[in-house]
Amino acid sequence: MHKQLPVICVAAGIVLLAACTNDGGQQQTTVAPQPAVCNGPTVEISGAEPRYEPLNPTANQDYQRDGKSYKIVQDPSRFSQAGLAAIYDAEPGSNLTASGEMFDPMQLTAAHPTLPIPSYARITNLANGRMIVVRINDRGLYGTDRVISLSRAAADRLNTSNNTKVRIDPIIVAPDGSLSGPGMACTTVAKQTYALPPRPDLSGGMGSASSAPAQPQGDVLPVSNSTLKSDDTTGAPVSSSGFLGAPTTLAPGVLEGNEPTPAPQTAPVSAPVTAPATATPVSAPAAAAPVSAPVSAPAAAASGRFVVQVGAVSDQTRAQQYQQRLSQQFSVPGRVIQNGAVWRIQLGPFASKAEASALQQRLQTEAQLQSFIASAQ
C-alpha cells in the first residue's frame, strides 16, 4: 500500500499539469508579466487617442473556435505579448467588427483573440522600435501563428510586413480619462489636433491686416547726413552723385522708387551732403529704420498655423540637437517645446497645411521618419 502511494501522486500531478495547459493558454503569455516600470527615458507616441469606453457586452465572453478555448483577458495590467503581426486589409465596409462597427482599414485599429473590446494597446515594432497606439475592436486571427492583426493604416505607420515581430502592451483608460498599464511605461500619448486658428475679425480688421507692412514704410524716412553716424561701410558706391534721381544701392527691405530712402546708404560718403540735406530732415534716431526692415521679415516667415512633430524625448539637449540636424537637412525652421517631462521636436511653423504635408512626405521618403501635423501654439 505504501509502495503505490508515489505512483498515485505522480499520476495526480500529471493530470493537474494537463488541466493547466489545456486552456487555450497559447493565445496569451505563458507567464503574466509584472506591471511595467519605466527605467529609461520617456518618449511621446501618437496613434489612436485613448478614451474611456464601456466594454461591449457581447464581445467579451469566453468562447471556443476550431476546438480551442479562448479566455478574455480580465486584467490587462498584467498582460503583455510578443509575436508576429498580420495585416488586416479587407475592403472598407465589407464586414462588421466584433464591436459592431464597420471595418475601416484607414483607422488605427487591430484584432486580437482575447483582449477586451474595445480597448487600447501600444504596439511596438521590435525591428525598428516604432510605436503607436491602436484601438482593439475586433477578434482574430485564428489558425495561424500571428498574435495580432493590424489595420493597413497601423501597419503602414509601424512599417511592418508579414514577417515583423511586434510587442503588445495594453493601455488602461480610467473613467476619469487617466491612462495606466504596461503600454504607458516610459510613454506619454500625444494629443493630436488639426484645429484651425480662430477666424480673423473682419469687422474693421482690414486696417489691422494692412498695418504690418505699413509699419516699415512709416519708419523709412530721409536722414540728414550731417547728423548720421554709422560704422557701416557697405552702403552706396563712392561714384554716386547723391542726386535724388541718381542710381544708388537700396538697403535690404526698402522698396525701389522711395527716393529719400537711399540717403542712409550714402552716409559713409562725404560727397553727397547738400542734396539729401535739402529734403525734409529728421533726427538721427531714424537711422535705425533700415535695420528694422530685415528683422521683421524673418519674424513674418517664422509665423504660421501648422507644425510637423517628428518626435519627443525626455532630454532637452538631445531634442535640440535632433531638431537642428533636421532643420539643416530639410532647410526648414524648427523648435523644441517642453510638454511636462518631455521635449517635443517640431519643424515649422508653416502658413498652410499643404506645406506641412509636403514636409511630412519628404520626412517619410528621405529619412523614413513618421510624423504628424499639429496646430502651432
From Swiss-Prot:
Compositionally skewed regions (Low complexity) per UniProt: 208-218, 264-277
Keyword Lyase: yes
GO cellular component, one term: cell outer membrane
Record bears the keyword Lyase: yes
Region annotation (Disordered) ranges: 196-277
Name of the top EC class for this enzyme: lyase
Alphabetized PROSITE patterns for the sequence: PROKAR_LIPOPROTEIN (PS51257), SPOR (PS51724)
A Pfam family the protein falls into: SPOR
UniProt superkingdom: Bacteria
Keywords from the UniProt entry: Cell membrane, Cell wall biogenesis/degradation, Lipoprotein, Lyase, Membrane, Palmitate, Signal
Its membrane topology: Lipid-anchor
Residues carrying lipid (N-palmitoyl cysteine): C20
Domain SPOR span(s) in chain numbering: 300-376
Residue positions bearing lipid (S-diacylglycerol cysteine): C20
EC number: 4.2.2.-
Principal subcellular localisation of the protein: membrane
Family note: Belongs to the RlpA family.
HAMAP family recorded: RlpA (MF_02071)
Protein name: Endolytic peptidoglycan transglycosylase RlpA
Organism the protein comes from: Salmonella typhi
Upper taxonomic lineage: Bacteria, Pseudomonadati, Pseudomonadota, Gammaproteobacteria, Enterobacterales
